[in-house]
Amino acid sequence: MDKLVDHFLSDQSRTMNEDLFSATSTELCYENLNRSCVRSPYSPGPRLILYAVFGFGAALAVCGNLLVMTSILHFRQLHSPANFLVASLACADFLVGLTVMPFSTVRSVEGCWYFGESYCKFHSCFEGSFCYSSIFHLCFISVDRYIAVSDPLTYPTRFTASVSGKCITFSWLLSIIYSFSLLYTGANEAGLEDLVSVLTCVGGCQIAVNQSWVFINFLLFLIPTLVMMTVYSKIFLIAKQQAQNIEKMSKQTARASESYKDRVAKRERKAAKTLGIAVAAFLLSWLPYFIDSIIDAFLGFITPTYVYEILVWIAYYNSAMNPLIYAFFYPWFRKAIKLIVTGKILRENSSTTNLFPE
């Protein structure tokens, strides 16, 4: 029997006996149950710090991505096929903050799962669905940016609202179908039945994934990653070439003769740069986790608990990063936030507000 267990996107409750902060004693998750999992509680100080750090991440993911979705869906100036992809990506990150991070906070700090066996499986499915949905969205966004930068004049006719809708539908359907079917058919536990039986206890949320499915999970992350790296490499080369062409003209000539195509290309390059940073942040956040998952599966479950928890929460925190990236690089997003938080969004005709002043 294959005795290697991997966590399907961070949803296994490991005993917290190797934590960064020392535990005070060993207890049971449910004191009156013989089949209860063992927990190692933190002392009050570290416990409060961890709740604050994890809770802040969840709140930022929920509020920040809610602002992104509200901005794009409310203001008509932002109604574009590319921005609809960004709004859908924000929805995935919003759902991570709402349905995954709060429960994982309790699991990570308390060392126990108190939300029932049914939601344990849902929680795992949500993690898988939202993670893969995010990477598929980012992959489509990179293709969108490549078309916009390489051929800005024909871009509006090539990447239409219909194309954007198909990309969004594909990203969500494939992610949800894959994650839920994998866990609810039990395919992930094939060959691990005896080990699962030994590990099962009340207050745990253990999801066993055999080597075959760990490898498939890794491929679902790796293939879109390679596509994005290739596409953004081409975008970088195109942007560099366009910049060199502009530099060949004198400043005075450039002001007089700068074409509509040049202005559009400049705007699209800036958007590509910002979204490229979002892609890089996603890859840097999730790549260590996926590398660790495949190492664990094939080398015998060797990752220390505290290392695993750090990798999981780095990945979770990515859901809170995109709104910060947009706020830093997009003046229109900062203006939209101001209109939303001051309540001006409730005024009549606020949806027609100009977010791009000259």
Swiss-Prot record:
It is found in: Cell membrane. The gene is Taar7a. SUPFAM superfamilies: Family A G protein-coupled receptor-like. It comes from the Eukaryota. GO terms for molecular function: trace-amine receptor activity. It comes from Mus musculus (Mouse). Glycans are attached at N34, N210. It holds the Pfam family 7tm_1. GO terms for cellular component: plasma membrane. Disruption phenotype: Mice lacking Taar2, Taar3, Taar4, Taar5, Taar6, Taar7a, Taar7b, Taar7d, Taar7e, Taar7f, Taar8a, Taar8b, Taar8c and Taar9 show no visible phenotype or behavioral deficits. They however show an absence of aversion to low concentrations of amines such as 2-phenylethylamine, isopentylamine, N-methylpiperidine and cadaverine. Residues 69-83, 144-166, 234-274, 334-358 are cytoplasmic. Olfactory receptor specific for N,N-dimethylalkylamines trace amines. Trace amine compounds are enriched in animal body fluids and act on trace amine-associated receptors (TAARs) to elicit both intraspecific and interspecific innate behaviors. Ligand-binding causes a conformation change that triggers signaling via G(s)-class of G alpha proteins (GNAL or GNAS). Its main location: membrane. The keyword Disulfide bond applies. Residues 1-47, 105-121, 188-212, 296-309 are extracellular. It is a multi-pass membrane protein. Belongs to the G-protein coupled receptor 1 family. The keyword Cytoplasm does not apply. The chain crosses the membrane at residues 48-68, 84-104, 122-143, 167-187, 213-233, 275-295, 310-333. Specifically expressed in neurons of the olfactory epithelium. Disulfide bonds join C37-C201, C120-C205. This is Trace amine-associated receptor 7a. Keywords: Cell membrane, Disulfide bond, G-protein coupled receptor, Glycoprotein, Membrane, Receptor, Transducer, Transmembrane, Transmembrane helix. In addition to the well known disulfide bond common to G-protein coupled receptor 1 family, trace amine-associated receptors (TAARs) contain an unique disulfide bond (Cys-37-Cys-201) connecting the N-terminus to the extracellular Loop 2 (ECL2), which is required for agonist-induced receptor activation.
